[in-house]
């Protein structure tokens, strides 16, 4: 099959068994994507609660691993100390190890994959192959307003927003804009996300379902997510079953 050849799964039989078996057991293996400020955290809480999903955050897994004493820990610390990104192979291994501990449980993978190479690794892994891939779609200007309006109090650690949650007048002079909340940084992060999201979608044969969050309340977005999860899967069948050659 085309996908087995192109993405070279570690175990082709396990790959196929996982794909069809998860759907037969009605398991949710949800990948939730979205640009910075799209509201992934809010919707992840809704989904985890309603569908009893195990929440998987690659960032949290990396931080937890750094507090352990293992060969992987040493590798991660070495990359971090040099200011380098942790290789995809290590991140994928951490996710696979974590999923192995939760058995046949529904799970939500938060904000991953972020690149074409990560998507390819996810697709090639029988344990990580998702049943649903959903993107929370937001407008760049809305993200700039949402994140660019944040203000941080270095004394208390509290975060405010100049429009939605202004800081009290007595501390207004001491709140600051964090580096990640500068407009130029936000726009660059959005650009990188949008560029890579299209590549991720391509790896999964355009199986990413986008939910437009503009003008929608949190509850309305949650309802749309519920509708998507009412489907057995969003993954295009051509990922597993190759298209027949058309007769000339």
UniProtKB/Swiss-Prot annotation:
PROSITE patterns, A to Z: ADENYLATE_KINASE
Residues reported in the UniProt entry to bind ATP: 37-42, 150
Region (NMP) residue spans: 57-86
Broad enzyme group: transferase
Keyword Manganese: no
Main location: cytoplasm
Alphabetical UniProt keywords: ATP-binding, Cytoplasm, Kinase, Nucleotide-binding, Transferase
CDD domains in the cross-refs: ADK (cd01428)
SUPFAM superfamilies xrefs: P-loop containing nucleoside triphosphate hydrolases
Localization terms from the record: Cytoplasm
GO molecular function: adenylate kinase activity; ATP binding
A Gene Ontology term for the protein's cellular component: cytoplasm
Region (LID): 149-181
Coiled-coil spans in chain: none
Role played: Catalyzes the reversible transfer of the terminal phosphate group between ATP and AMP. Plays an important role in cellular energy homeostasis and in adenine nucleotide metabolism.
Family, similarity comment: Belongs to the adenylate kinase family.
Protein name (database record): Adenylate kinase
Taxonomic lineage from the root: Eukaryota, Metamonada, Diplomonadida, Hexamitidae, Giardiinae
């Amino acid at each position: 099959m085309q996908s087995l050849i192109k993405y070279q799964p570690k175990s082709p039989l396990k790959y196929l068994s996982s794909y069809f078996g998860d759907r037969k057991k009605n398991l949710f293996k949800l990948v939730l994507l979205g640009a910075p400020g799209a509201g992934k955290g809010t919707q992840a809480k809704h989904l985890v609660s309603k569908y009893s999903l195990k929440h998987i955050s690659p960032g949290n897994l990396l931080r937890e691993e750094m507090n352990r004493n293992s060969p992987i820990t040493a590798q991660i610390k070495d990359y971090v100390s040099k200011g380098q990104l942790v290789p995809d192979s290590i991140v994928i291994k951490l996710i696979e190890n974590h999923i192995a501990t939760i058995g046949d449980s529904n799970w939500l993978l938060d904000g991953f994959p972020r690149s074409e190479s990560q998507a390819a690794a996810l697709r090639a892994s029988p344990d990580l192959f998702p049943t649903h891939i959903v993107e929370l779609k937001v407008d760049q200007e809305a993200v700039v307003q949402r994140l660019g309006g944040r203000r941080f109090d270095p004394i208390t650690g509290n975060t405010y927003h100049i429009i939605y949650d202004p800081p009290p007048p007595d501390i207004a002079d001491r709140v600051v804009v964090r580096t990640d909340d500068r407009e130029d940084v936000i726009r660059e992060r959005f650009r990188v996300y949008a560029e890579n999201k299209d590549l991720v979608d391509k790896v999964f044969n355009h199986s990413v379902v986008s939910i437009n969050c503009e003008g929608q309340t949190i509850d309305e977005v949650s309802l749309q997510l519920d509708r998507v999860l009412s489907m057995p899967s969003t993954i295009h069948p051509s990922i597993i079953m190759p298209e027949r050659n058309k007769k000339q």
